Amino acid sequence: MSKPFMFEKPFGMRDTLPEWYKTKKNICDQMTEEINLWGYDMIETPTLEYYETVGVVSAILDQQLFKLLDQQGNTLVLRPDMTAPIARLVASSLKDRAYPLRLAYQSNVYRAQQNEGGKPAEFEQLGVELIGDGTASADGEVIALMIAALKRAGLSEFKVAIGHVGYVNALLMDVVGNEQRADRLRRFLYEKNYVGYREHVKSLNLSTIDKSRLMNLLSLRGGRAAIEEARGLIQTEKGKTALAEMTKLYEVLESYGASEYVKFDLTLVLHMSYYTGVVFEGYGNRLGVPLCSGGRYDELLSKFHRPAQATGFGVRIDLLVEALNGEIISNGHEQTCILFSNERRFEAIELARKKRANGEAVVLQDLAGVTDVDAMSSNYQDVIYCIGTAGRGGEDA
C-alpha cells in the first residue's frame, strides 16, 4: 500500500463542513425535540464495544466490522449499529428498570466498505427503541413517531413501506420447503432484484401453481387491498398471523392520522437478520435509497439474558439532509462580521456583546489579521466596519 497524501482520509470517512454541520444540527435538534415530546429518553453508548458481545450479536456482517485490540488483548469493534449496544445497556445498566422502556439516541456508526462501493464507512443515525411491548400499538407508535419526526425536520414528501418478516418467511418456506432455497429468494428481495427473482423462480422445479404464488408475491404492494390479496397466497398459520398483525397495525396508524404516509410492501426484506415481525423503510422525495428503516426484533434481548419484545427505527441523517434539498428549515442565525482596527477595539467588542445578547451571531475580526478584506467580507451576510478614529457601519475615518 502506498503512503497516503497528507490531505487524504481513510476510505469511506467524510469531513463535515460548516454549512452542512449547521443544517444537520438544526435537523437533529428538531427531530430530538419531537422525540422528547413522545416521552423517549436520550442515551449514549461507547464508540467501542467488545467484539464478543455487541460485535457477535450485531446483524452487520463480520467483514464490515472495524476491529482493533486493546492493551489486554481483547478484540474491540467500532459500534456497527445502535440496536445491539442499546440491548446490552438495557440488560446491564438498566436491568432494574421496569418495561416498557422508551429510549432514543443520536450517534455515529461504523461499517467498513469496499473500495468500489461508494458508501460511507461512518454515518450518523438518530432513532428510538421501544423495549418491552409486543403489541401492535408499539409498532404503530414508533412508525407514527418516525413520520412525525420527519415532518418536524421539514420533510413533506415521503412514504413508509411496511412489510412483515413472518409473512415472507412463511410463504417462501411453504412453497420451496427448505431454508437454503428460501434464503436464495430472500436475497433477491433484499437486493430488490425482481428480474433475478423472476428468473430464479422460473428455474425452480415447482408446480405451475406454486410458481404463480411466488410470482404474485411481487404484486403485493399498496393499501389495505394488498393485505386481502396476500391472504390468497398463504396457507400456513404463521402467514395468517402476520397478516392479522399488519391489519391491526394499519388500524393503529389510522388512529394516529398517519395512514396517508404508509403503504404495504409484502416483498420487503431488510438486511438486519434479527428482525422478527413488522419491518419498514422510509423513502424521501427524489431519493432512490431508504433514508430510515426499522422493525420488530423480539429475540435480540434474550442474547443479553434479559428477554423482551422490542421495536424501533433509525434515520440516516446524511440521507435526510439530501432528501430535504431545499426544504431545510432555516436556523435563523446568519452571521455578521465586525471588522475593527486597534483603536476601535473596545467599541467593536461592546457592539458585538450587545448583538450577541440579542441572539445575533457575530464574528469579531481584527483588520490586522486580514489580507483580503473583499474576499473575507463575502463570507458574511453583513459587515460592520469599526476602523479609524471616527464612524462605523461602513464609514472609514
Curated annotation (Swiss-Prot):
Main location: cytoplasm
InterPro entries reported in the protein's UniProt record: aa-tRNA-synth_II, aa-tRNA-synth_II/BPL/LPL, HisRS-like_core, HisRS/HisZ, HisZ, HisZ-C
Protein name, per record: ATP phosphoribosyltransferase regulatory subunit
Gene Ontology molecular function: catalytic activity, acting on a protein; histidine-tRNA ligase activity; transferase activity
Name of the encoding gene: hisZ
Gene3D superfamilies: 3.40.50.12590, Bira Bifunctional Protein, Domain 2
BP terms from Gene Ontology: histidyl-tRNA aminoacylation; L-histidine biosynthetic process
Lineage summary: Bacteria, Bacillati, Bacillota, Bacilli, Bacillales
Pfam families: HisZ-like, tRNA-synt_His
Source organism superkingdom: Bacteria
Pathway stated in the Swiss-Prot or TrEMBL entry: Amino-acid biosynthesis; L-histidine biosynthesis; L-histidine from 5-phospho-alpha-D-ribose 1-diphosphate: step 1/9
Any one Gene Ontology cellular component term annotated for this protein: cytoplasm
Family that this chain belongs to: Belongs to the class-II aminoacyl-tRNA synthetase family. HisZ subfamily.
Other facts noted in the record for this chain: This function is generally fulfilled by the C-terminal part of HisG, which is missing in some bacteria such as this one.
Function: Required for the first step of histidine biosynthesis. May allow the feedback regulation of ATP phosphoribosyltransferase activity by histidine.
Localisation: Cytoplasm
Record note on quaternary structure: Heteromultimer composed of HisG and HisZ subunits.
Keywords from the UniProt entry: Amino-acid biosynthesis, Cytoplasm, Histidine biosynthesis
